[in-house]
Amino acid sequence: MIRTMLQGKLHRVKVTHADLHYEGSCAIDQDFLDAAGILENEAIDIWNVTNGKRFSTYAIAAERGSRIISVNGAAAHCASVGDIVIIASFVTMPDEEARTWRPNVAYFEGDNEMKRTAKAIPVQVA
């Protein structure tokens, strides 16, 4: 059996730009891409915490250290500057590998300040 697993996640980054007329994609600070293990041109899902919209696009690199999250093209209708979003990528793998897989997660606060990284998502408690 093949399973689709979370590969990497940027948790609660803030949109810094939204450019309707750029040709598409989401530009992401290269440091952030590295932290989540997301590659340039990789498919990503974006979940907008602020407005509830969910959409897919692909990642492109923004300048390292810039803290840029720029939602571009038609996707700019789904996010505005200042919105808080979660950006995720996924990977497929055999069931036996999936059972021990741990995703790359980066957590953010404020103006895209990376607070920590982890190889797991905490267990949710009531």
Swiss-Prot record:
Gene3D superfamilies, per this entry? 2.40.40.20
What CDD domains does its record include? Asp_decarbox
Annotated metabolic or biological route of this protein: Cofactor biosynthesis; (R)-pantothenate biosynthesis; beta-alanine from L-aspartate: step 1/1
Active site residues of this protein = S25, Y58
Against Pfam families, the record matches this protein to: Asp_decarbox
This enzyme's EC code(s)? 4.1.1.11
Q: Name one GO cellular component term.
A: cytosol
Co-factor note (free text): Binds 1 pyruvoyl group covalently per subunit.
Molecular function GO labels: aspartate 1-decarboxylase activity
Give the UniProt keywords, A-Z. Answer: Autocatalytic cleavage, Cytoplasm, Decarboxylase, Lyase, Pantothenate biosynthesis, Pyruvate, Schiff base, Zymogen
Spell out the reaction equation it catalyses.
L-aspartate + H(+) = beta-alanine + CO2
Task: Tell me which Gene Ontology terms the entry assigns under biological process.
Answer: alanine biosynthetic process; pantothenate biosynthetic process; protein autoprocessing
Q: Where in the cell is it found?
A: Cytoplasm
Q: Where does this protein hold substrate?
A: T57, G73, A74, A75
Protein origin, superkingdom? Bacteria
PTM comment, free text: Is synthesized initially as an inactive proenzyme, which is activated by self-cleavage at a specific serine bond to produce a beta-subunit with a hydroxyl group at its C-terminus and an alpha-subunit with a pyruvoyl group at its N-terminus.
The entry's function note states: Catalyzes the pyruvoyl-dependent decarboxylation of aspartate to produce beta-alanine.
Subunit organization: Heterooctamer of four alpha and four beta subunits. Interacts with PanZ.
Q: What is this protein called?
A: Aspartate 1-decarboxylase
Question: What is the native source organism of this protein?
Answer: Escherichia coli (strain K12)
Phylogenetic classification of the source organism: Bacteria, Pseudomonadati, Pseudomonadota, Gammaproteobacteria, Enterobacterales
